[in-house]
Amino acid sequence: MKVSRRTAVSCQAWSYVAWLGVLVTTIGAGDALGAEVLPNACLVDGCEVKILGVKPAGEELELTFESNFSPDVSKNHFHVWWGEKFTVEQVGRNAETVHGVTQGRWHRHDDYPTYVTTGAASTSVREGAATVCVSPADRNHNIIDVKIYNCVEVSSYL
């Protein structure tokens, strides 16, 4: 059987397209083969994050989180702060405009599932505080829902 050059090129092109499809499918399904990939968007019940574990990490603390969304600091992410220093209403950019309270200090991040305290959540700035807190925040660094936050007493790790 004689195959024309045009047919051979066409078959080669289809072969590349097929391999590209396999590659895209494999890359896209990579996480499906291992851990579950969570959306960044909040579910119907809202974005939630909890501190499941705490352990020393040098002079800082390593927190282990459980969340129902995948954090991204340019989208929905986490705010961590010292609970004795600020309320959940204070740890967002809309503290004064929406909640009528003085804006506090927090550390924004998307480290997941573990995070080591730093910045405004560092142990070096806790000033005697012994409760670390976390809450979901949006891309504008506003707390998504001030009723949804989690705090853990950590004095035994300091």
Model region roles, listed by residue range:
Residues 35-58, 66, 157-158:
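Short, compositionally biased P/S/T/A/G/V-rich stretches that sit at domain boundaries
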Residues 1-12:
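N-terminal secretory signal peptides that target proteins for export/translocation
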Residues 12-27:
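Bacterial N-terminal signal peptides
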Residues 60, 66, 70-157:
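Long, low-complexity serine/threonine/glycine- and acidic-rich segments characteristic of extracellular
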Residues 29-35:
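Boundary at the C-terminal end of the N-terminal hydrophobic targeting segment
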Residues 10, 16, 50-54, 63:
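N-terminal targeting/docking segments
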Residues 6, 36-37, 42, 128, ...:
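Disulfide-bonded cysteine motifs in exported proteins
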